[in-house]
Structures are given as C-alpha cells and as structure tokens.
C-alpha cells in the first residue's frame, strides 16, 4: 500500500474513528484501526465488537492495500506531523512508513486478515431525519440513560417510531426523559440504541445534513455524511413508559428555566460525591422556596413563580433535578406535581415536544 493524503483530513478521521477502538482487547487487532486504500479513497475503520465507525477520505493511491495500525500511536503521530501532505507506505513485512516533511516513522502493523469483519445485516426499517433534530433529541434524553449494567436494557434509549412521530425515551429508575419530533415516515417500529452509540452519534452530527438510519433485527446503521456508525441493538422488553407518567396534577407552576437552574445550583453547593442531601422545594402562593441541609451547613433561597393548586413540599436529588432542567430548550418550563411522593413532571409551557420526570427523595421532618 502506498498513498498520499492531507494531514488535516487524516487527523480528523483518525480522531473520530478511534473512539470506536477497544482500549484493551484479547484480540490485538481491535486495538488498532483498519486502513484500506482502493480507488481514490482511504477507508478508515475502528471497531470494538459493539460499535464500529468507518469513514472515507480523499487520497492519491499509488498502490492499493490494507493494514491495521495501533490506533493510539497512529493518532499521536498524525496529530504531530509537521507538514500538510502525509505519505503512508507499507511493505510485505507489515512495516508502515509514515513521512511528512523531514519527519518519518516506521511502525509495525498487522495484517487486515486479523481484523474482525464489521457486521452486515438485512434492513427491516429505515428513517431519514434532519441532523439538527436528531442531535437535539439525543442530547435532551441521553443524560437519563442508566449506567447500571444489572439491567442492560436501560443502558440504551427506546426509539419509538409511529404515526409519523419519532420519540426517544431514556430511563434509569430515578428519572425519565422523552423527546419527540414529527418525521416523514410511515413505519411503526421500536428499537433500543445503546447510550454509548448515541454519544458517538452526537459528536459526528452536522446540523445541515440529514442522517439516514437503517435498522435490522440486531443492528443499526447511522449514515452521517462520510461516516458510517454501526452498532448492536439492545434486546429485551423496555418499560411501558406511557403508563409511568402520572395523570393527576394537584400543583402546577410556570417557571423561568434559568432562574430555576440557578436556584437549584446554589443549593447544590452543600452536596458532593459523598453527601446526598435532598434539595427541599416548597411550592406555595407566588413563589418556590428552596433549602438544603447537609453535614457541612444550610442554605436557603427562593424564586418568584405563580403556583396553581395545592401547596406542596417535596425533595429532589440536586443532580437529577439539574440534569433535567439543563437539557430542555425552552426559556420557561411547566412543573406539575401530584403530592410529595409522586414524580415531578417537567414539560414545555406550550406543546408536548419533551417530558422529563424526576423521582422525589423522602424528606425528614427536620
């Protein structure tokens, strides 16, 4: 294999693809990236048996071929090369020569035969969606994906496509996030995408470009400009999320989002990794009063907000509360409550583009 390629194109591609590379694997090739030089394109792939990222960049190919190179080392080399044009050449001993300006490297590669094939699958459904919409949907829900592997199904989000509407639902047992957008698609299907995959999708999405999603029985493929991201789907039964949203609402308040975030953030100063005291919220009259008491002190605050319905005193984990508030995209939110032990519901003042639920913490009588 012998080729010339622009360093900036190569560095960006290697950086993005390397996120799918296994940091430690019993298969040495999976700690590398696969380079394939054919035609006028250099194909670059990373794969950890759960998620694979592939892209193609323009290159001047003098000799076709394939090689697997250490992802960590190759990324560092490319990032620090002095000139814009990079020459990459391999020989029959799997030695890779990398030259740029006066700098040159010789590193040991591996045969592409040792690299596992990325999955292929039969498409059962497909969807095309604006990159901006998909980015906002994932960003406003992925925070609620569980990191507890005892229930693997909740380490991903449910993509629920029906009635020309796509909903993304994430839940971890303490909070739930739902985001929806209308789409031009007649399919009725559900599938569960791992949270890790969604995080990688976020880093690649361009707002101006559409994302094409191909769904199979066990795998999903996201096509984002020149990048292809293939991932396994999570298998199992997802919670009936519609039934978990409380129907009754005894208390409602419309609150400025930024003011609410600031108040909860101030209470959070008394909490830390080892301290988890609830933020106490009292909804009454025309204000919401906040307080927090922990082993290191006390704090109080209040903000103006017209409260309709019954007065209520309720407590929340500050981090869960803030995560929900920071991932809405409206200046004001509607807070709905059904007593001190029922989840808080956060929705837009108008419409139903998102729903966030936060389970309360029991309060002591102190």
Regions found by a protein language model. Give the residues of each.
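Structural preference for solvent-exposed beta-strand-turn elements
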Residues: 1-366
């Amino acid at each position: 294999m012998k080729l010339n390629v622009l360093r900036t194109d190569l560095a960006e591609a290697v950086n993005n693809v390397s996120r799918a590379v296994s940091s430690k694997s019993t298969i040495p090739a999976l700690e590398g990236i696969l380079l394939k030089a054919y035609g006028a394109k250099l194909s670059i792939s990373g794969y950890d048996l759960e998620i694979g990222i592939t892209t193609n960049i323009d290159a001047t190919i003098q000799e076709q071929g394939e090689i697997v190179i250490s992802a960590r080392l190759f990324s560092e080399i490319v990032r620090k090369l002095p000139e814009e044009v990079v020459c990459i050449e391999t020989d029959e001993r799997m030695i890779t020569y990398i030259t740029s300006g006066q700098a040159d490297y010789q590193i040991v590669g591996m045969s592409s035969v040792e690299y596992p094939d990325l999955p292929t699958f039969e498409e059962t459904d497909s969807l095309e969606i604006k990159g901006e919409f998909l980015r906002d949907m994932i960003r406003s829900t992925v925070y609620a994906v569980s990191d507890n592997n005892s229930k693997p199904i909740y380490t991903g989000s449910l993509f629920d496509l029906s009635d020309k509407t796509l909903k993304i639902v994430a839940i971890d047992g303490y909070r739930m996030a739902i985001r929806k957008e209308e789409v031009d698609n007649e399919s009725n299907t559900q599938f569960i995408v791992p949270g890790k995959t969604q995080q990688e999708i976020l880093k690649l999405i361009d707002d101006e470009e559409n994302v094409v999603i191909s769904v199979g029985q066990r795998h999903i493929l996201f096509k984002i400009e020149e990048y292809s991201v293939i991932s396994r789907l999570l298998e199992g039964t997802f919670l009936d999320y519609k039934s978990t949203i409380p129907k009754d609402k005894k208390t409602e308040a419309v609150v400025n989002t930024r003011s609410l975030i600031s108040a909860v953030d101030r209470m959070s100063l008394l909490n830390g990794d080892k301290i988890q005291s609830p933020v106490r919220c009292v909804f009454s009259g025309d204000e919401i009063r906040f307080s927090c008491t922990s082993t290191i002190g006390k704090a109080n605050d209040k903000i103006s907000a017209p409260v309709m319905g019954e007065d209520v005193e309720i407590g929340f984990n500050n981090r869960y509360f803030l995560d929900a508030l920071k991932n809405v995209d409206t200046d004001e939110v509607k807070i709905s409550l059904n007593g001190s032990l029922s989840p808080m519901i956060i929705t837009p003042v108008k419409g139903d583009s998102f729903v966030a639920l936060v389970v309360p913490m029991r309060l002591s009588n102190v």
